[in-house]
């Protein structure tokens, strides 16, 4: 059988059968990579071919109706078909940018390919054939890149001139092998968020390159390489994991995408370090709340703070219902300069963008909850975990294999698309567009924050090469019914959250205090902004750091339930020593005294022992008490008792093991108050004597024998008053 008979036969967009006349094997090979084509099985069975043809015609009939609308005119339908045909013909005649390097003459190597499915969390291995250049053509801060060709597993003959162009990347300095696998997991998790962004119908869709690992088992040590397609065009870094944005590279879509991931995930993560060609991105970084996933590039809430310090909400953010992050007036002035630069951006809104958090397009992952559910398991708010989002099938039949898995696990699956309305089909088409990724060939270091990208080698992607995006990474498959998931797992539901403090405060106010303190990631982001200001990160070396902005974010963090911020503001406003913003002092006014005591009282209610003692002393002595309150020994006794009983963690998850006052001193003060009475507290000599005895025992344990004897004497005096 001739080689060209072994190539997949395709059906064109007009439903006609493909003809081999006038087409060589390379042409046929090219066609089956276009995502608008249906791949048919190789068979000589005439009846089977007829069945396949009818399926293809039915599929493309539905596809055309979806794209053009059920009420669209035949003229618009014809225009859609012609556009696809024109794009395919153009792709076929693109030259190979690496032809001059004659990679086909290099020795063939056997490699084990590791592919990651971000939906199921599974790794699969298979064998591939590659040809890799011996010298790198690009070098970044941490990795170097090698030109590579990989033979498609779909081919039955080794046609290396028709093989796809790839880029193999390896770390310059030796790293643990697990780092390679973490990088792939990160990029494929980020790809899911790109697909979710596309389902909200933005003006321009985004896609993140698919990446896998190849293990060259015939080389010494069996080294690992990352493998990506070669990207066509100019490589640009739009933002980094430290929030850096080049003025001449400001675009709307990359910044809006990062902002979207923060709100859509309920503040549990943000995808940053956006770089690539156009809106085809590679080497992103994900910052998570805990900061423990995905290696050293994950800066946690600090990375989120860095992004929002330099982020100016644009018209895409507004059209998708994303809320601006709260900045101080001085910070806002700096961001407004970027806002003026955004006016030159050419992106035009269609007016059909979906609002972030639209329940109609929320989907769930299949067999194993992916990144977002793993993050939710570690989040402080057990009852407010987030819904995860699965990508749609990348082809009409791609849901089938995983559907069997899901049925096995009793997950409700849309095995077919019967329940999909016209708008759902639109999303499937949008997803198909987003999956049409190119080939990456540029070194991109997500861990080198502020370095400008080095000059890159440019070139056209090889149009007549198989993209093989379906085999280089395991895409998403299967969609789970959200309503059923909510019924089975109501505690896992987590709606998207806005970036605005006022709206987050409204959500927290509906919770009791025990679930309010330390449960807002947005509060942690504002607290990180405080630390960056205090550390001088946001100012020039010779400038004073912005104290007003630091206090602004500290107050917002306190409003959002961050215990450290609440305590810090309470001490600061009360003119007491404080560890956060230690160089900042505020005016001593009645208003500030009231604010300070209110913050300390809130911290005491949240379980902070130091604040309990300060509040008790204020009610006891009247010092540092707010002007609108008066001495109240019953309140003081309550807080002294609470401080004595506090031996577990506070609401912020911390335990203060360094006692501000020893236990015997607090017990003795309680006994003294009960012995004399006053300020709303009745005398109780018997209780006073008991407390003096407890104070004496505590003093003995602390090796304070002389003080213990004094307490025993006072206990006898108190009991003597009781007998009188």
From Swiss-Prot:
GO molecular function list: ATP binding; calcium ion binding; calmodulin binding; elongation factor-2 kinase activity; translation factor activity, RNA binding
Record note on modification: Autophosphorylated at multiple residues, Thr-347 being the major site. Phosphorylated by AMP-activated protein kinase AMPK at Ser-397 leading to EEF2K activation and protein synthesis inhibition. Phosphorylated by TRPM7 at Ser-77 resulting in improved protein stability, higher EE2F phosphorylated and subsequently reduced rate of protein synthesis. Phosphorylation by other kinases such as CDK1 and MAPK13 at Ser-358 or RPS6KA1 and RPS6KB1 at Ser-365 instead decrease EEF2K activity and promote protein synthesis.
Gene source species: Mus musculus (Mouse)
Catalytic reaction equation(s): [translation elongation factor 2] + ATP = [translation elongation factor 2]-phosphate + ADP + H(+)
Subunit field text: Monomer or homodimer. Interacts with Calmodulin/CALM1; this interaction is strictly required for phosphorylation activity.
Gene assigned in the entry: Eef2k
Name the UniProt record assigns to this protein: Eukaryotic elongation factor 2 kinase
Residue ranges of the region described as Disordered: 353-476
Gene3D superfamilies to which the protein is assigned, alphabetical: MHCK/EF2 kinase (3.20.200.10), Phosphorylase Kinase, domain 1 (3.30.200.20), Tetratricopeptide repeat domain (1.25.40.10)
Tree of life domain: Eukaryota
Lineage, uppermost ranks: Eukaryota, Metazoa, Chordata, Craniata, Vertebrata
PROSITE patterns the UniProt entry points to: ALPHA_KINASE
Reported function: Threonine kinase that regulates protein synthesis by controlling the rate of peptide chain elongation. Upon activation by a variety of upstream kinases including AMPK or TRPM7, phosphorylates the elongation factor EEF2 at a single site, renders it unable to bind ribosomes and thus inactive. In turn, the rate of protein synthesis is reduced.
């Amino acid at each position: 059988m001739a080689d060209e008979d072994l190539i997949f036969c395709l059906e064109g967009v007009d439903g006609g059968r493909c003809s081999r006349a006038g087409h060589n094997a390379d042409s046929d090979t090219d066609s089956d990579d276009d995502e608008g084509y249906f791949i048919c099985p190789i068979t000589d069975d005439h009846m089977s071919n007829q069945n396949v043809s009818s399926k293809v015609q039915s599929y493309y009939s539905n596809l055309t109706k979806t794209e053009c609308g059920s009420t669209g005119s035949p003229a618009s339908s014809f225009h859609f078909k012609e556009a696809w045909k024109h794009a395919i013909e153009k792709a076929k005649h693109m030259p190979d940018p690496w032809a001059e390097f004659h990679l086909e003459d290099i020795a063939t190597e056997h490699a084990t390919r590791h592919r990651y499915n971000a939906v199921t969390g599974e790794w699969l291995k298979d064998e591939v054939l590659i040809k890799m250049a011996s010298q790198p053509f690009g070098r970044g801060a941490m990795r170097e890149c090698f030109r590579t060709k990989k033979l498609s597993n779909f081919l039955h003959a080794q046609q290396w001139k028709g093989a796809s162009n790839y880029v193999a990347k390896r770390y310059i300095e030796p790293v643990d092998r697990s780092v390679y696998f973490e990088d792939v997991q990160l990029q494929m998790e980020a790809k899911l968020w790109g697909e979710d962004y596309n389902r909200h119908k933005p003006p321009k869709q985004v896609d993140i390159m698919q990446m896998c690992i190849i293990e060259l088992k015939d080389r010494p040590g069996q080294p690992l390489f990352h493998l990506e397609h070669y990207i066509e065009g100019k490589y640009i870094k739009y933002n980094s994991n430290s929030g850096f944005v080049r003025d001449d590279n400001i675009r709307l879509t990359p910044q809006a995408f990062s902002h979207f991931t923060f709100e859509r995930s309920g503040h549990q993560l943000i995808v940053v370090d956006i770089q690539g060609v156009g809106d085809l991105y590679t080497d992103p970084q994900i910052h998570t709340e805990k900061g423990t996933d995905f290696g050293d590039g994950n800066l946690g809430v600090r990375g989120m703070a860095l992004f929002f310090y330099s982020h100016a909400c644009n018209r895409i953010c507004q059209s998708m219902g994303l809320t601006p992050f709260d900045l101080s007036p001085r910070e806002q002035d700096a961001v407004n300069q970027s806002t003026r630069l955004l006016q030159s951006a050419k992106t035009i809104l269609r007016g059909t963008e979906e609002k972030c958090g639209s329940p109609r397009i929320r989907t769930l992952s299949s067999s194993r909850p992916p990144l977002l559910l793993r993050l939710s398991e570690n989040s402080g708010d057990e009852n407010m975990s987030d819904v995860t989002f699965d990508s749609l099938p990348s082809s009409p039949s791609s849901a089938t294999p995983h559907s069997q898995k899901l049925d096995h696990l009793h997950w409700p699956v849309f095995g077919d698309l019967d329940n999909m309305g016209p708008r759902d089909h639109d999303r499937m088409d949008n997803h198909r567009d987003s999956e049409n990724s190119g080939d990456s060939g540029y070194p991109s270091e997500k861990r080198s924050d502020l370095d400008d990208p080095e000059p890159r080698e440019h070139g056209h992607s090889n149009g007549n090469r198989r993209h093989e995006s379906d085999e280089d990474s395991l895409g998403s498959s299967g969609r789970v019914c959200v309503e059923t998931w909510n019924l089975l797992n109501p505690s896992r539901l987590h709606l998207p959250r806005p970036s605005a403090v006022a709206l987050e405060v409204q959500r927290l106010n509906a919770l009791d205090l025990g679930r309010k303190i330390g449960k807002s990631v947005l509060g942690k982001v504002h607290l990180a902004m405080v630390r960056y200001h205090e550390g001088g990160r946001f100012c020039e070396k010779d400038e004073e750091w912005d104290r007003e902005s630091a206090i602004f974010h500290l107050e917002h963090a306190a409003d959002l339930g961050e215990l450290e911020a609440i305590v810090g503001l309470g001490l600061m406003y009360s003119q007491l020593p404080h560890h956060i913003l230690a160089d900042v002092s505020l005016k001593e006014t009645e208003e500030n005294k009231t604010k300070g005591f209110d913050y300390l009282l809130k911290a005491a209610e949240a379980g902070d022992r130091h604040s309990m003692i300060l509040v008790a002393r204020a009610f006891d002595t009247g010092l540092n008490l707010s002007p609108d309150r008066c001495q109240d020994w019953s309140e003081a006794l309550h807080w002294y008792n609470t401080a004595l009983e506090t031996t577990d963690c506070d609401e912020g998850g911390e335990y203060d093991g360094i006692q501000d006052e020893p236990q015997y001193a607090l017990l003795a003060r309680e006994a003294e108050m009960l012995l004399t009475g006053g300020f709303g507290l009745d005398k109780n000599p018997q209780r006073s004597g008991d407390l003096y005895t407890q104070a004496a025992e505590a003093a003995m344990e602390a090796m304070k024998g002389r003080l213990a004897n004094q307490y025993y004497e006072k206990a006898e005096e108190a009991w003597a008053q009781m007998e009188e």
